[in-house]
Amino acid sequence: MMNEDGAYSKKDLEASSRGELFGPKGPRLPASNMLMIDRVITMTKDGGMHGKGYVEAELDVHPNLWFFGCHFIDDPVMPGCLGLDAMWQLVGFYLGWLENEGKGRALGVGEVKFKGQVLPDSKKITYCIDFKKVITGKLIMGIADGKVLSDGQQIYTADDLKVGLFKNTSF
């Protein structure tokens, strides 16, 4: 189900994890705790810094999020890898929004920089994904640059996020 305005609620994102949003052959988001997104604010086919597409999404932060209890005891901080994974999740979600089929897999990232952190007193994480290229055909792949903001302050950047969609994942 492609919303023209590209906005999706938490309920929609959870439906994606069950294969109910983009159909049984479309890419899925992870379920439950590994879903690092509460809502997608907007997606465009021709927006962003490179004019190839843009996604903006958010996660509400509260002190009882699962990772704060274990990373680290007496020094809670969101693992940076979860912010990176959220950006990969959004690249795959965008490929599904464009009506591509296959199982999503992160294929790599060029460079990641961490300049800040998400702490239990943070309120909101914003993810911004600027697409550089979408390849369709035998290979389906999205390549994008991303950034993560905590309460409006940029804390992570990732260049050349790559996600592919595969019909067969038994490789």
UniProtKB/Swiss-Prot annotation:
Record: active site: 71
Keywords: Cytoplasm, Fatty acid biosynthesis, Fatty acid metabolism, Isomerase, Lipid biosynthesis, Lipid metabolism, Lyase
Pfam family, one: FabA
InterPro entries assigned to the protein according to its UniProt record, in alphabetical order: FabA, FabA_FabZ, HotDog_dom_sf
Chief localisation class: cytoplasm
Enzymatic reactions: a (3R)-hydroxyacyl-[ACP] = a (2E)-enoyl-[ACP] + H2O; (3R)-hydroxydecanoyl-[ACP] = (2E)-decenoyl-[ACP] + H2O; (2E)-decenoyl-[ACP] = (3Z)-decenoyl-[ACP]
Localization annotation: Cytoplasm
EC number(s) reported in the record: 4.2.1.59, 5.3.3.14
Alphabetized Gene3D superfamilies for the sequence: Hotdog Thioesterase
Keyword Metal-binding annotated: no
GO CC annotations, alphabetized: cytoplasm
GO biological process: unsaturated fatty acid biosynthetic process
GO molecular function: (3R)-hydroxyacyl-[acyl-carrier-protein] dehydratase activity; trans-2-decenoyl-acyl-carrier-protein isomerase activity
Biochemical pathway: Lipid metabolism; fatty acid biosynthesis
Subunit structure and binding partners: Homodimer.
UniProt family annotation: Belongs to the thioester dehydratase family. FabA subfamily.
Function of the molecule: Necessary for the introduction of cis unsaturation into fatty acids. Catalyzes the dehydration of (3R)-3-hydroxydecanoyl-ACP to E-(2)-decenoyl-ACP and then its isomerization to Z-(3)-decenoyl-ACP. Can catalyze the dehydratase reaction for beta-hydroxyacyl-ACPs with saturated chain lengths up to 16:0, being most active on intermediate chain length.
The name this protein goes by in its record: 3-hydroxydecanoyl-[acyl-carrier-protein] dehydratase
